[in-house]
Amino acid sequence: MAEKRNIFLVGPMGAGKSTIGRHLAQMLHLDFHDSDHEIEQRTGADIAWVFDVEGEEGFRRREAQVIGDLSERQGIVLATGGGSVQSKDIRNYLSARGIVVYLETTIDKQVARTQRDKRRPLLQVDDPREVLESLAEIRNPLYEEIADVIVKTDEQSAKIVANQIIEQLGF
């Protein structure tokens, strides 16, 4: 696996993709990118605005373009959006262009980590837990389908999880 130089982090909201990704990139001396941040940079607006104006379909179109572009680079760690795996094109990009690491977490941890975050449009509802459970049913099999490595993120610091990923990848 070590011949694939890019590392792509997939997993649900609140799994720690961005935080762990930054640690991982620093430890491996790779460039770090976050697909949501890149979308915001390219549009000049936050994700919530893109959802409001263009809907989820418009956001997903932008996400596929951004991940397609970023995954063509070499030597990066990319934190993807939680729903990106719902796109077959994105799953194909990630599988073909790097090592895919699924950061797995429980619904309880997701709720705890995202409850005060107003930047997550899909969770601005009365019962975010119900939304997270519904998304998990759809997305978890897709994360598993493309994962080269699965790492649980519930009980450990981001730095420890990054070290576990490095060990599992043999870097």
Curated annotation (Swiss-Prot):
Its cofactor is Mg(2+). Mg(2+) binds at residue 18. ATP binds at residues 14-19, 120, 156. One of its GO terms (cellular component) is cytosol. This is Shikimate kinase. Pfam families: SKI. Belongs to the shikimate kinase family. InterPro entries: P-loop_NTPase (IPR027417), Shikimate/glucono_kinase (IPR031322), Shikimate_kinase/TSH1 (IPR000623), Shikimate_kinase_CS (IPR023000). Monomer. Keywords: Amino-acid biosynthesis, Aromatic amino acid biosynthesis, ATP-binding, Cytoplasm, Kinase, Magnesium, Metal-binding, Nucleotide-binding, Transferase. One of its GO terms (molecular function) is shikimate kinase activity. The gene is aroK. The keyword Isomerase does not apply. CDD domains: SK. Its EC number is 2.7.1.71. One of its GO terms (biological process) is chorismate biosynthetic process. Its main location: cytoplasm. Pathway: Metabolic intermediate biosynthesis; chorismate biosynthesis; chorismate from D-erythrose 4-phosphate and phosphoenolpyruvate: step 5/7. Gene3D superfamilies: P-loop containing nucleotide triphosphate hydrolases. Catalyzes the specific phosphorylation of the 3-hydroxyl group of shikimic acid using ATP as a cosubstrate. Substrate binds at residues 36, 60, 82, 139. Binds 1 Mg(2+) ion per subunit. SUPFAM superfamilies: P-loop containing nucleoside triphosphate hydrolases. The keyword Cell inner membrane does not apply. It is an enzyme of class 2 (transferase).
